[in-house]
Amino acid sequence: FPMTVTRYYLSLIDWDNPFCDPVFRMCIPSIEETDLSGDFDTSGEADNTVISGLQHKYDQTALILSTHRCAMYCRHCFRKRLVGISDDETADNIEEMAAYVSQHSEISNILISGGDAFLNSNQVIKRYLEQFSSIPHLDLIRFGTRIPVVLPMRIYDDPELLALLKTYTQKKQIYVVTQFNHPNELTDEARKAVKALLDSGI
């Protein structure tokens, strides 16, 4: 499986004792990953895919795999079959997905995930927001991302992204769903990214 780690996240590792460091274990490959037994699609995502990149497993939620890329490939990821490897399962037609959601009034929210949703360009993020914010029966739009944890400056140093989120959350409530796995990830930079999101109404 591929390895990609941001310089920022590497800086959180205690290099005097790396093999016992929780951040190290989340980002540096282990020999245990060579055990390929088991199922690569542990949550049955293939069975719930209705359009390339769009899953509809739960009545009220549509899940979009917006990209196969991440800023860091977490060693515990349950989508190892695709992240950093293949875009075969990711979205390639935003308009088609929006049309599907429009035709299914039971869907009250979408989760734009990946890969990492915030590794998309601002232009792509805007296209998602444009398409889905106009659907009346959607209550909210969620973005699944580890960017606040592994590359927080992507958020707090990007006024264009923050302005985009601030504008569209006034049309349709936006949530950012992230994942802090250890207290060592709760840095000043991460807090700054979270505060920037909160200050933008997210």
Where are the language model's segments positioned?
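Flexible, acidic/Gly-rich N-terminal and inter-domain linker regions that tether
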Residues: F1-K57
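N-terminal pre-triad scaffold of radical SAM enzymes
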Residues: P2, D47-F78
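Short secondary-structure boundary/capping elements
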Residues: A46, Y58, E89-N93, D157, ...
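Conserved catalytic-core segments centered on acid/base and nucleophilic motifs
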Residues: I64-L65, H76-C77, N109-F118, F132
